[in-house]
Design a protein with these regions (language model features):
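Amphipathic alpha-helical segments that mediate coupling or scaffolding at interfaces
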Residues: 14, 35-38, 58
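Extracellular/periplasmic head regions of type IV pilus-like filament subunits
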Residues: 56-129
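N-terminal single-pass transmembrane signal-anchor helix
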Residues: 2-32
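Short, low-complexity, Pro/Ser/Thr/Gly-rich segments in the mature regions of secreted, periplasmic
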Residues: 133-141
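N-terminal cationic leader/targeting segments used for protein routing and processing
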Residues: 3-6, 122, 127, 141
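Aliphatic-rich helix starts adjacent to a transmembrane/signal segment
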Residues: 31-50
Length: 141
């Protein structure tokens, strides 16, 4: 009797391949997540610089910074949720000095404690990104 050789993989070979793929995925997923966090942090840094340039242009033209009366305003609900459409948390800056105010690049926004914030009495200002940078572990900047 002749034996016919069947082509294919054994169940053991398939299990080995699946195990190797699972291990590779376990290694790659955290690396990709870290690179996404770093990319969002780089975007936030660029946004801060862009707004700084717009604020300085506003001051050159008006003699003061856009005032919030000294109160904090921001796109996150914890800062009043002003203009999450990226138009209202820095008064009078859009559209003359900047096309739109930045939104946090994290797609899960709005979140109560992450986003951009601004405060000014007209003479000076504070502008920042709350709960960032993401790429640092908590407590280890």
């Amino acid at each position: 009797m002749k034996r016919i050789k069947q082509a294919g993989f054994t169940i053991i070979e398939m299990l080995i391949v699946v195990t190797i793929l699972a291990m590779l995925a376990g290694i790659l997923v955290p690396v990709l997540e870290d690179s996404q966090k770093s990319a969002r942090d780089a975007r936030r840094s660029a946004d801060l610089k862009t707004v700084q340039v717009a604020l300085e242009a506003y001051k050159r033209e008006n003699g003061v910074y856009p005032s919030t009366g000294g109160s904090w305003q921001g796109d996150a609900p914890s800062y009043g949720g002003f203009g999450y459409d990226a138009s209202g948390y820095i008064p009078d800056l859009v559209p003359t000095f900047i096309q739109a105010l930045p939104k946090d690049p994290d797609g899960s926004i709005p979140v109560a404690d992450r986003g951009y914030f601004y405060r000014s009495n007209g003479a000076d200002y504070k502008f920042g990104a709350h709960k960032t940078p993401e790429s640092f572990e908590a407590g280890n900047p």
